[in-house]
Swiss-Prot record:
Self-association and partners: Homooligomers. Forms double-helical filaments necessary for the formation of replication compartments within the host nucleus. Interacts with the origin-binding protein. Interacts with the helicase primase complex; this interaction stimulates primer synthesis activity of the helicase-primase complex. Interacts with the DNA polymerase. Interacts with the alkaline exonuclease; this interaction increases its nuclease processivity.
Stretch list, region Required for nuclear localization: 1171-1196
Similarity comment text for this entry: Belongs to the herpesviridae major DNA-binding protein family.
Region feature Disordered, mapped onto this chain: 1176-1196
Job of this protein: Plays several crucial roles in viral infection. Participates in the opening of the viral DNA origin to initiate replication by interacting with the origin-binding protein. May disrupt loops, hairpins and other secondary structures present on ssDNA to reduce and eliminate pausing of viral DNA polymerase at specific sites during elongation. Promotes viral DNA recombination by performing strand-transfer, characterized by the ability to transfer a DNA strand from a linear duplex to a complementary single-stranded DNA circle. Can also catalyze the renaturation of complementary single strands.
Descriptive protein name: Major DNA-binding protein
GO biological process, one term: DNA replication
Record organism: Human herpesvirus 2 (strain HG52)
Zinc-finger ranges (unnamed): 499-512
């Protein structure tokens, strides 16, 4: 496998402090925007906000910096001092530690701090406990306000800090340089800044964490140095402990949270540290192994196998240590993406008033709620994969034979309260007698405590998590019964509620109530087998290989080795460029709008009669035929491209960026990205553990310290081997930049000195920059040397990919969307007897069942029917895409892909296809959906919710999430979206004798089905990705260039459509009414589109709903709705008087139509007129002239 060579680029960064404390008067404008984007619990005065230019930092803010992190002795005798600089970037979050109460809380949920304090000991995690010396020397927010001349009651203080040194502030290893204060302008306001520097400056050559920072007599302090007062602010330290360290501790299974903070800080200060960073006394969760046996961790079971469960615990802590080290490396990286600038956000363009601006931001955040819900409710989400299981040795007879898949992550959320074990497998004191929940098959409910743990026990992040969950659908769209919040609250007035968090007046907004409303979607942990990881990430490039055939005939495959051609010439002959030309011509014909690929362009004005339909279809066919023929001619004759091999190697591919500024402007979204990255790092580290353990005495006390560097190097060697793309940078200081820092002798109130010399500690930076995700286009069978288990898995997939021989319903074929949309124009008389409304379902069902009276058809009708049938049959004969086109864009791209598959002699199996589930937002569809935001609760809850619904413009956050699907991914990915998808990382060696480990990030599935997202369906031939677009919203728009199958309303309705019949519309409506009852009236056109993926039927459903409400005199009645549906069914079931019927089955089969698909070989009907397939047979080029060596298109 070829990999890109490592390239080294020199980047210049300015020297500076490791952070700032910003102090400002509470802004009069922009406060509502800042509140919406921040994470704050209503019972705390602290908050986490995003770093945004124009909102929290000034214009021109430099994201990358060479931070002062210490000092070194230089010169003869070591008498001089120079500064040690470390490249880093500023954290995408800022931490408000004073005045947070001025920001509106993210949710009205009460007592979230109490919930976190209760959950922390329940799961065994340590609480924040400042030392007495810290409290004695606290720098309070009031004191800082007084120094800055700000009113403490109206001031806002927040920390802006580099990514790698957040933990250093948490453990008081920094100080404020009060003499270096300056002023900047944010918006129209003047803001104070106080630089933050490390205490290590005053301890030359000391590159470690200072355990007792308030000891001014520390022996490492330089002679005559004026040691400053360390910066300790209790609210800030606790906020960092909860929002920064807590999530990492949960992800790494480290119950001693303070030790995680110190380990991370140590890795930041000591660039040469390679040994173990996490403490030796780390504990482990007891649980039953996934094989159903007791965990191989108890001492009595212990040493019969290879070290019993000892290796499992060792792999757990060493993988966590390696992941922490890798995260530290990424935190010191220098990235290209600038911080988000609110003045450039497209979503705010044209929004003149603060309310309108806030409403636009609220609508965008509601889009992201769909992705957050998927991460919470998917059982293989990175949020839940917190424990390590052991599959045992790959070869039971040879325990030393390494396996990449022996150790793997499993869901641990539901077993986190189990007893804790020490290194030897003994239960830790204090955990005796605790019940042990099983890894599979537990009965415990997903509760608020679990949600708190997912957020690292941070009330602020938990509040923002609830902000998103309040905007998630509880299952209405898939036919589940959603809890009636009004009734629940009313009934709870006389009963006890187990949460102990809320009162009757606040129950509607309580975290427990929100989880109860979403109960049908709670994750069900029914399997602990090794599988994919559900990750949250961001596409930061407009380029992706997500066309129907992926990266087939891509630039890299066509480029000649001698480099004799220019780039443009090569690009014009790629499959990607051919698809672009097709789409451009379709747009010129006004058939499509590339910006909205699902739209029908101006077809409504173009297709005014049946002749226009013929023209449109023929234009599409001829355009695609021409492009495909030219493409294949260029590939075969011009480049001698191995076109069949190229198809076998083609992949759908995209890259997820690790740049922190590409994530959404929200602390909770940044948490999801961080947890996803930590899960990926641990997966990679776990794959190398067995190789490190092989042949070693793992029980030795010093094994971890000795072999942690070995594991770390192995993980670093995985860079640039197919999955984790890395970048190597040479860091230099900006030209002419003076190194300004506090005087080491004059005190921290003295002005900064600019006479310092300094050097960069990490001159060469090698760090991962993106994750590459792939999905093979063709279904590939097991290789000859695959294991028996792998061959069995492939055999089980074959039936899912096997193309059936059945004839497809015309309306479910390539032209079905046009026939339904324009039926009244094409067949104006195609309506049931006694009806004035043309009905495509009735017409085509009767026609295909040979039940349509011939007298109803004119000659022109028959010619059009022949044209449609011929096209549909010919398309079906070569079709290997298990999706029917829903629009012209899909029709053209699918037809084009099928033509190329025909040239490549593909047969038998469907190819893999991609579907994007695009997150959208809308105002609450019902009063129930707005209950959590009602200004009053208790007995007045329903009235308060109705009042809110009547004045939605006054509530910028009152939006809910929704989804729509799109099967053409390139325009979706061009919007550089935030995404959620399943990721399975394969590891394998290269060529024989090569010990280089390659990886492949395989596009996989989210487990949980409709729990994760209502539009996910179980189809092995499709890969799904949830996407929330960024381009056009928070960044500039670029030019276009498996859970178990769940029977839901969505499947039921699509099954009805697939069965066909004249009464499809009424059957769909009846099934929906019976499933949803009165909630049917709440479904809007977007909901019907999401459920049915059929615009015509969606409009029919809205019409049925309107008629049902009219029949009930404005009130919903199930009887009236069913009556309307049955009347419609009766209308389309009439066939009129008996007489001669039109024989659709035989019609057209006797003619060998010349207008076939470019001479395609496929029998078009029962008459079986054979059509010669030129490429059929053992030797597709056997009839070519023997003397001609080069392959030509004519040979095909």
């Amino acid at each position: 496998m070829d990999t890109k060579p490592k390239t080294t680029t020199t980047v210049k960064v300015p020297p500076g402090p490791m952070g700032y404390v910003y102090g400002r008067a509470c802004p009069a404008e922009g406060l509502e925007l800042l509140s919406l984007l921040s994470a704050r619990s209503g019972d705390a005065d602290v908050a986490v906000a995003p770093l945004i230019v124009g909102l929290t930092v000034e214009s021109g803010f430099e994201a990358n910096v060479a931070a002062v992190v210490g000092s070194r002795t230089t010169g003869l005798g070591g008498t001089a001092v120079s500064l040690k600089l470390m490249p880093s970037h500023y954290s995408p979050s800022v931490y408000v530690f004073h005045g947070g109460r001025h920001l509106a809380p993210s949710t009205q949920a009460p007592n979230l701090t109490r919930l976190c304090e209760r959950a922390r000991p329940h799961f065994g995690f340590a609480d924040y406990a400042p030392r007495p010396c810290d409290l004695k020397h606290e720098t309070t927010g009031d004191a800082l306000c007084e120094r800055l001349g700000l009113d403490p009651d109206r001031a806002l203080l927040y920390l802006v800090i580099t990514e790698g040194f957040r933990e250093a502030v948490c453990i008081s290893n920094t100080f404020l340089h009060l003499g270096g204060m300056d002023k900047v302008t944010i918006g129209d306001a003047e803001v104070h800044r106080i630089p933050v520097y490390p205490l290590q400056m005053f301890m030359p050559d000391f590159s470690r964490v200072i355990a007792d920072p308030f000891n001014c007599n520390h022996r490492s302090i330089g002679e005559n140095f004026n040691y400053p007062l360390p910066f300790f602010n209790r609210p800030l330290a606790r906020l960092l402990f909860e929002a920064v360290v807590g999530p990492a501790a949960v992800a790494l299974r480290a119950r001693n949270v303070d030790a995680v903070a110190r380990a991370a800080a140590h890795l930041a200060f000591d660039e040469n540290h390679e040994g173990a960073a996490l403490p030796a006394d780390i504990t482990f969760t007891a649980f039953e192994a996934s094989q159903g046996k007791p965990q191989r961790g108890a001492r009595d079971a212990g040493n019969k196998g290879p070290a019993g469960g000892f290796e499992q615990r060792l792999a757990s802590v060493m993988a966590g240590d390696a992941a922490l080290a890798l995260e530290s490396i990424v935190s010191m990286a220098v990235f290209d993406e600038p911080p988000p600038d609110i003045t450039t956000w497209p979503l705010l363009e044209g929004q003149e008033t603060p309310a309108a601006r806030a409403g636009a931001v609220g609508a965008y955040l509601a889009r992201a709620a769909g992705l957050v819900g998927a991460m919470v409710f998917s059982t293989n989400s990175a949020l839940h994969l917190t424990e390590v299981d052991d599959a045992g040795p790959a070869d039971p007879k040879d325990h030393s034979k390494p396996s990449f898949y022996r150790f793997f992550l499993v869901p641990g959320t539901h077993v986190a309260a189990n007893p804790q074990l020490d290194r030897e497998g003994h239960v830790v004191p204090g955990y005796e007698g605790r019940p042990t929940a099983p890894l599979v098959g537990g009965t415990q409910e997903f509760a608020g405590e679990h949600l708190a743990m997912l957020c690292g026990f941070s009330p602020a992040l938990l509040a923002k998590m609830l902000f998103y969950l309040e905007r998630c659908d509880g299952g209405v769209i898939v036919g589940r019964q959603e809890m009636d919040v009004f009734r629940y609250v009313a009934d709870s007035g006389q009963t006890d509620v187990p949460c102990n968090l809320c009162t009757f007046e606040t129950r509607h907004a309580c975290a427990h109530t929100t989880l109860m409303r979403l109960r049908a979607r709670h994750p069900k942990f029914a399997s602990a087998a090794r599988g994919a990881i559900g990750v949250f990430g961001t596409m930061n490039s407009a380029y992706s290989d997500c066309d129907v055939l992926g990266n087939y005939a891509a630039f890299s495959a066509l480029k000649r080795a001698d480099g004799s051609e220019n780039t443009r010439t090569i690009m014009q002959e790629t499959y990607r460029a051919a698809t672009e030309r097709v789409m451009a011509e379709l747009e010129a014909l006004q058939y499509v709008d590339q910006a909205v690929p699902t739209a029908l362009g101006r077809l409504e004005t173009i297709i005014g009669n049946r002749e226009a339909l013929h023209t449109v279809v023929n234009n599409i066919k001829q355009l695609v035929d021409r492009e495909v023929e030219q493409l294949m001619r260029n590939l075969i004759e011009g480049r001698n491209f191995k076109f069949r091999d190229g198809l076998a190697e083609a992949n759908h591919a995209m890259s997820l960026s690790l740049d922190p500024y590409t994530c959404g402007p929200c602390p909770l979204l940044q948490l999801l990205a961080r947890r996803s990255n930590l899960a990926v790092y641990q997966d990679l580290a776990l794959s190398q553990c067995h190789g490190v353990f092989a042949g070693q005495s793992v029980e030795g006390r010093n094994f971890r310290n000795q072999f942690q560097p070995v594991l770390r190097r192995r993980v670093m060697d995985l860079f640039n081997n197919g999955f984790l793309s890395a970048k190597t940078l040479t860091v230099a200081l900006s030209e002419g930049a003076a190194i300004c820092a506090p005087s080491l002798t004059a005190g921290q109130t003295a002005p900064a000195e600019s006479s310092f010399e300094g050097d960069v500690a990490r001159v060469t930076l090698g760090f991962p920059k993106e994750l590459r995700v792939k999905s093979r286009v063709l279904f590939a069978g097991a290789s000859a040397n695959a294991s028996e288990a792998a061959k069995a898995r492939v055999a089980s997939l074959q039936s899912a990919y096997q193309k059936p021989d059945k004839r497809v319903d015309i309306l479910l074929g390539p032209l079905g969307f046009l026939l339904k949309q324009f039926h009244a124009v094409i067949f104006p008389n195609g309506k049931p007897p006694g009806s004035n409304q043309p009905n495509p379902q009735w017409f085509w069902t009767a026609l295909q069942r040979n039940q349509l009276p011939a007298r109803l058809l004119s000659r022109e009708d028959i010619e059009t029917i022949a044209f449609i049938k011929r096209f549909s049959l010919d398309y079906g004969a070569i079709n290997f895409i298990n999706l029917a086109p829903n629009n012209v864009s899909e029709l053209a791209m699918y037809y084009m892909a099928n033509q190329i598959l025909r040239y490549c002699d593909h047969s038998t199996y469907f190819i893999n296809t991609l579907t994007a589930v695009i997150a959208g937002s809308r105002r609450p569809p019902s009063v129930q959906a707005a209950a959590a935001w009602a200004p009053q609760g208790g007995a007045g809850l329903e009235a308060g919710a109705r009042a809110l619904m009547d004045s939605l413009d006054a509530h910028p956050g009152a939006w809910t999430s929704m989804f729509a699907s799109c099967n053409l991914l390139r325009p979706v990915m061009a919007a550089r979206p935030m995404v959620v998808l399943g990721l399975s990382i394969s590891k394998y060696y290269g060529m024989a004798g090569n010990d280089r480990v390659f990886q492949a990030g395989n596009w996989a599935s989210l487990l949980g089905g409709k729990n994760a997202c209502p539009l996910l369906i179980f189809d092995r031939t499709r890969k799904f990705v949830l996407a929330c677009p960024r381009a056009g919203f928070v960044c500039a728009a670029s030019s276009l260039g498996g859970g178990a199958h769940e029977h839901s309303l969505c499947e039921q309705l699509r099954g009805i459509i697939a069965e066909g019949g004249a009464a499809v519309a009424s059957s769909v409506f009846v099934a929906t009414v019976k499933s949803l009852g009165p909630r049917t009236q709440q479904l809007q056109i977007e909901d019907w589109l999401a459920l049915l993926e059929d615009e015509y039927l969606s409009e029919e459903m809205m019409e049925f709903t309107t008629r049902a409400l009219e029949r009930g005199h404005g009130e919903w009645s199930t009887d009236a709705a069913l009556e309307v549906a049955h009347e419609a069914e009766a209308l389309v079931s009439q066939l009129g008087a008996a007489g001669e019927v039109f024989n659709f089955g035989d019609f057209g089969d006797e003619d060998d139509h010349a207008a076939s698909f470019g001479g395609l070989a496929a029998a078009a009907g029962a008459a079986g007129v054979a059509r010669k397939r030129a490429f059929h047979g053992d030797d597709p080029f056997g009839e070519g002239p023997p003397e001609k060596k080069d392959l030509t298109l004519d040979m095909l």
